[in-house]
């Protein structure tokens, strides 16, 4: 449903007897092998075009100024075109907390190349099954995904994050990822950017799949 976000239905429980003082409130969190000042970050969205590069540079500027982690969209376009500069934000923002991502269909050597070229704090490996199915040029072979994931988890020189792209990650997938060596997952559920909607607007004809997947709240509850 356009405009719907599952977090709108979440109500916080009021507690009348606090156990800490206000100045003891601590927002720091730990994931992907390190501590972070905030429990949120600017997640992967775009890249691979002039407009995408403009958006990435603006987001990187904000992220650096605020001390927030910024993740670029899939680096796959730059792997095909070495002249692609839409992901090169560290040169302009040397203090930026930076990470990037590529698709799980990419073999380990391309993941290593991505790390060498971008020097991220971690690498997201994204799973986008429904998006691929809706893309006329999308992947149709998925048997190698789990093998790729196991290789990344074992050999990657930086922390690995297995990332959904807005369809939610179910408990079975999370459990299988753990068995393959993954220690950090991004369950990104329905309610934000919809790549099903984007692909259907781009020329697809399966609008009945625009709302496919679990919401982020459903995915969070399922992951407990």
Q: In which residue ranges do the predicted regions lie?
A:
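Hydrophobic faces of well-ordered beta-strands that scaffold small-molecule active sites
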Residues: 40-43, 68-73, 96-102, 121, ...
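Active-site cofactor/substrate anionic-group-binding motifs, chiefly glycine-
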Residues: 30-77
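Phosphate/diphosphate-binding glycine-rich loops and adjacent basic-rich segments that engage nucleotide
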Residues: 120, 125-152
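Glycine-rich phosphate/ribose-binding loops and adjacent secondary-structure elements
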Residues: 143-146, 150-224
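An N-cap/entry alpha-helix motif that binds or orients negatively charged groups
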Residues: 1-32, 36
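Acidic (Asp/Glu)-rich catalytic clusters
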Residues: 30-34, 58-65, 86-94, 112-120, ...
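N-terminal active-site wall of soluble small-molecule enzyme domains
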Residues: 58, 81-90, 107, 148
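Active-site mouth loops of central-metabolism enzymes
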Residues: 41-53, 99-109, 161-170
């Amino acid at each position: 449903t356009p405009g719907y976000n599952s977090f709108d239905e979440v109500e916080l429980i009021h507690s009348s007897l606090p156990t800490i003082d206000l100045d003891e409130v601590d927002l720091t969190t730990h994931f992907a092998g390190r501590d972070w000042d905030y429990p949120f970050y600017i997640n992967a969205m775009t890249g691979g075009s002039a407009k995408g590069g403009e958006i990435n540079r603006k987001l990187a500027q904000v992220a650096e100024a605020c001390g927030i982690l910024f993740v670029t969209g899939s680096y796959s376009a730059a792997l095909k075109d070495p002249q692609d500069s839409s992901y090169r934000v560290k040169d302009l923002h040397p203090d930026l907390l930076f990470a990037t991502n590529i698709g799980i269909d990419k073999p380990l050597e391309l993941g290593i190349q991505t790390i060498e070229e971008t020097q991220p704090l971690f690498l997201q490996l994204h799973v986008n099954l429904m998006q691929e199915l809706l893309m006329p040029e999308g992947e149709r072979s998925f048997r190698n995904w789990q093998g790729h994931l196991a290789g990344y988890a074992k050999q990657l020189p930086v922390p690995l994050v297995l990332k959904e792209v807005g369809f939610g990650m179910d408990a079975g997938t999370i459990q299988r990822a753990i068995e393959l060596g993954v220690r950090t997952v991004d369950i990104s559920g329905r309610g934000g950017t919809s790549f099903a909607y984007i692909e259907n607007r781009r020329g697809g004809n399966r609008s009945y799949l625009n709302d496919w997947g679990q919401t982020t709240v459903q995915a969070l509850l399922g992951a407990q």
